[in-house]
């Protein structure tokens, strides 16, 4: 398997235009996804995770959101590379659903209520390959069976409201994978599901990835999911990457106060009972993510950070190299230990 990146993002800057001003939602973002690799994109709500994924798919609201700078290099199934930030909408339509698949958080909003499940899953084959409706339906039934939906042929003839939440999410995964994409973007795909179904969906995605060798960008706020499914993690805050590296290294040895705060905020089995006994509270990060229209000067995390010094408010820190594979956007990263 080639180790040339499937996705190579450099210097991505995404801007939203309002009546008053332009707001930078994603700033100077670099992400690489290799074949067969899962990279997790994590952070609180408002950190820029979903805007990054929508930028890759070129699904930003027209005339409001746009890519202002940077490149998004995709290596498609043909082996050829293309800069998604530079192509027109017609060329992008040929890539969406073909070379890139996407799974959204809420399947009921990504499935059309007036079309059957089978028709929706098979549609990318008809659009991108000119497959007949009958052949596309057969492929949809086969894939529904692969993603673990029982009685797949009958389910293919049903409508989204007739399926459970877990089945609908399996159907959206099937729709994203029907054309065998080289890259799958999963934007909070298990958040709306209960814990048992969530585990099943994660197992399914890992199984399908191992069979196809596709790369996956997994957007989530759940660090427990990251530990289970990803090899590398990218932590975002207020539109910028603040830490990135191998999951095991970042989780064992975080070098940014925000990452450390996220890890300490994770509840663990038995924590609630023990903490209640001792009269303690769950760890939280003080304050809120700042609005992108009113970012503080310097490091955006500084107002919430217990490590902050005067220099933190003066300028945005560069992404420093902790080692060859691990980076931190903190001027005091050498003093930080979990």
Curated annotation (Swiss-Prot):
Its EC number is 7.4.2.-. Residues 10-263 form the ABC transporter domain. InterPro entries: AAA+_ATPase, ABC_Ni/Peptide_Import, ABC_transporter-like_ATP-bd, ABC_transporter-like_CS, Oligopep_ABC_C, P-loop_NTPase. ATP binds at residues 43-50. It is an enzyme of class 7 (translocase). It is found in: Cell inner membrane. GO terms for cellular component: plasma membrane. It holds the Pfam family ABC_tran. It comes from the Bacteria. Keywords: ATP-binding, Cell inner membrane, Cell membrane, Membrane, Nucleotide-binding, Peptide transport, Protein transport, Translocase, Transport. Its main location: membrane. It is a peripheral membrane protein. Probably part of an ABC transporter complex that could be involved in peptide import. Probably responsible for energy coupling to the transport system. This is Putative peptide import ATP-binding protein BMEII0863.
């Amino acid at each position: 398997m080639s180790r040339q990146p499937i996705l190579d993002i450099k210097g991505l800057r995404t801007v939203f235009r309002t009546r008053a001003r332009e707001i930078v939602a994603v700033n100077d973002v670099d992400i690489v996804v290799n074949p067969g690799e899962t990279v997790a994109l994590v952070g609180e709500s408002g950190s820029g995770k979903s805007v990054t994924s929508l930028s890759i798919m070129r699904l930003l609201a027209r005339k409001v959101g746009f890519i202002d700078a940077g490149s998004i290099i995709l290596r498609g199934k043909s082996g050829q590379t293309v800069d998604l930030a530079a192509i027109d909408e017609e060329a992008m339509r040929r890539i969406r659903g073909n070379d890139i698949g996407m799974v959204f958080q809420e399947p009921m909003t990504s499935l059309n209520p007036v079309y059957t499940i089978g028709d929706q899953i098979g549609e990318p084959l008809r659009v991108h390959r000119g497959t007949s409706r009958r052949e596309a339906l057969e492929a949809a039934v086969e894939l529904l069976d692969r993603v673990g939906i029982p009685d797949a042929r009958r389910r293919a003839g049903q409508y989204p409201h007739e399926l459970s939440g877990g089945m609908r999410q399996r159907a959206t995964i099937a729709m994203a994978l029907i054309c065998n994409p080289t890259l799958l973007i999963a934007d909070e795909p298990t958040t709306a599901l209960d814990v048992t179904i969530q585990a099943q969906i994660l197992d399914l995605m890992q199984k399908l990835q191992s069979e196809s060798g596709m790369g996956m960008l997994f957007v989530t706020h759940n660090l427990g999911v990251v530990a289970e499914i990803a090899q590398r993690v990218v932590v975002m805050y207020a539109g910028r990457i603040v830490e990135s590296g191998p999951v095991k290294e970042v989780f064992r040895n975080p070098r940014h106060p925000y990452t450390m705060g996220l890890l300490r905020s994770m509840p663990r089995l038995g924590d609630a009972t023990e903490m209640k006994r001792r009269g303690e509270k769950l760890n939280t990060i003080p304050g809120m993510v700042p609005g992108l229209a009113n970012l503080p000067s310097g490091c955006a995390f500084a107002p919430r950070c217990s490590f902050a010094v005067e220099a933190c408010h003066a300028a945005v820190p560069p992404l420093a190299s902790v080692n060859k594979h691990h980076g931190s956007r903190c001027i005091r990263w050498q003093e930080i230990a979990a």
